[in-house]
Amino acid sequence: MTIVKFKPQRVDRRNHNTPILFDKEIDEYAQAVLADYKPELLSEPGTINFQHFLESYLGMGLDFQDIYSDDPERPILAMTVFKKGKVRVFDKENERIRRITVPARTVIIDNAVMEPGKESLALFSGMHEGGHITIHWHVYTGETYDGDEYSMDYNEEDALNPIVCCRREHIEIKGNMKKDRTAKEWREHHADYFAAAIIMPIITFKPFVNKILRENGYYKGAITIGRDDDLDILADDIIPDAITETYGVSKRAARIKLRKTGFVLNK
């Protein structure tokens, strides 16, 4: 299957051609990908199957391991192996750390993420990696865009590690706005925003939320937290619960999306 390729209008030449993007551009790209992959998700709210998306649409291999992290407080939830390489995993049977060879085009999800009750974390972790694959393929492989003015010679000495490790703080971003990001932080933001954009596409998300607001008798625009207890419950519990049930995301991800789309404001 041929995927919808991402071609940014601007890149940071000093940082491996990391795309310079507005969130709106990622929303538009995510919608184009969904239109190509599973268009029904643009007309009817539902939960995307991240494993099918990664394997069948993006053509990635998918593996599950006990990923070793050198910092237990910052566990690695998932990683993308753009080029063949070795990664460290924990061998529970022999109680030791070992290095395994992983083929190119592989996404590894930590086994702990796949435990029962963590479906929303697994979904976001998988689609976060999908964001790196679709938006940052050229950044980590050195491949250039076809006919793109941003092409550059690939310098192995200056190349980024083609194995991207995504820790909990990269995937469970709190939604805080930070303008002065490093190139790496921007790439993690791109991947995180893409995950939210393709899991909860604006084209279905806004009508879905508006419907819940109307069903609860609210027609006055954004809800500002802290002014009315009943509205606080609607904004921070009732609507997020409905989003969680429909899209398969965590309640926190639902709350962040409500604020990013202007439905809920903090006082």
Task: Please provide the spans of the model-predicted regions.
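Active-site hotspot residues in diverse enzymes, especially metal/ion-binding acidic/histidine motifs
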Residues: 1-267
